[in-house]
């Protein structure tokens, strides 16, 4: 299983970024969460098969719909949390 934290910066809040990321993650079979951060960014914790997680990363890097000036940073997630689905954390 592959686990990563994806940080999306730019104009990413208030544009449907979490909702579209939720939909894409579910289609790909990725579990975890997406949440708004106080610094104006969006954080995605993604876990699943290497192929599924890599596809979500590639989708983010190609430009999440409705975002402006998007920057995508990815790092391995060292936690041992197990998520059974993908959700929006408010």
Swiss-Prot record:
Record's catalysed reaction(s): an acyl phosphate + H2O = a carboxylate + phosphate + H(+)
Annotated ranges, domain Acylphosphatase-like: 3-90
EC number(s) from the headed UniProt entry: 3.6.1.7
Record: active site: 18, 36
Hydrolase is among the record's keywords: yes
Homology family: Belongs to the acylphosphatase family.
Protein name: Acylphosphatase
Source organism of the structure: Shewanella oneidensis (strain ATCC 700550 / JCM 31522 / CIP 106686 / LMG 19005 / NCIMB 14063 / MR-1)
């Amino acid at each position: 299983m592959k686990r990563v934290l994806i940080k999306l910066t730019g104009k990413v809040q208030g544009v449907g970024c979490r909702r579209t990321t939720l939909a894409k993650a579910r289609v790909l079979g990725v579990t975890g969460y997406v949440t708004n951060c106080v610094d104006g960014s969006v954080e995605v914790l993604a876990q699943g098969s290497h192929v599924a997680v890599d596809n979500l990363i590639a989708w983010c890097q190609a430009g999440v719909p409705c975002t402006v000036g998007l920057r995508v940073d990815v790092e391995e997630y060292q936690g041992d949390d197990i998520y059974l689905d993908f959700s929006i954390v408010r």
